[in-house]
Regions:
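Bacterial N-terminal signal peptides
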Residues: 17-30
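Hydrophobic small-molecule pocket/channel-lining residues, especially in calycin-type beta-barrels
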Residues: 35-182
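Compositionally biased, intrinsically disordered low-complexity regions enriched in proline and serine
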Residues: 9-10, 18, 101, 180
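N-terminal secretory signal peptides that target proteins for export/translocation
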Residues: 1-16
Length: 182
């Protein structure tokens, strides 16, 4: 009889531990799911839809200079990675990779045009992402700082709108680029 009691006691303790763990998981899981499910996922291979996009008038910035062109996005955990391949002035393709942390902390990216510092922040509802960037460049021996603000919004699962505003000593230029998911 003593043997059966010990066995029951062991099972009872194990059972209580399992119940406690289950209760904790039931309470934590919805919070974790809501935190992840509430944020837009921009991952995909995106192609510029020139017909739906709006570029600045004149020669102030073609689609390529205002963030246009095709790009690939991966969004894993707390990192948004944007890979763009463009044709350079020499006709050769060049690839640039920008990484942004999605927690409101500063990200630093380096390119042939200089170092950029960016902060990405989510809207309160998690449906849009704003990326504010500051880049200092040397142009013809003169140091210039350009600031940009991009707002990324998924209009549906196959369409991404990126609204861009760039400020420089020459003024502000705005563009709206619409992308279709491949």
């Amino acid at each position: 009889m003593k043997r059966n009691t010990e066995k029951f006691h062991f099972n009872s303790t194990t059972f209580m531990q399992l119940i406690s763990l289950t209760i904790i998981l039931v309470l934590i899981a919805p919070v974790m799911t809501t935190a992840q499910a509430g944020k837009a996922n921009f991952a995909g291979d995106w192609t510029l839809n020139a017909e739906k996009s709006t570029q600045p008038p004149g020669g102030q910035g073609g689609a390529m200079r205002m963030g246009g062109g095709n790009f690939l996005v991966t969004q894993e955990a707390n990192i948004l990675t944007v890979v763009r391949t463009r044709t350079g002035q020499d006709g050769q393709p060049t690839t640039s990779t920008m990484k942004y942390t999605l927690d409101g902390k500063e990200s630093v990216n380096t390119s042939p045009r200089g170092e950029s510092k960016s902060v990405a922040t989510w809207s309160a509802d998690g449906k849009s992402l704003t990326i504010e960037t500051s880049r200092t460049m040397d142009i013809n021996g003169e140091s210039r700082t350009m600031k940009s603000k991009e707002e990324w919004v998924l209009t549906d699962s196959k369409s991404l709108t990126v609204t861009i505003a760039r400020k420089s000593p020459d003024g502000e230029v705005k563009a709206v680029n619409v992308y279709d998911k491949k």
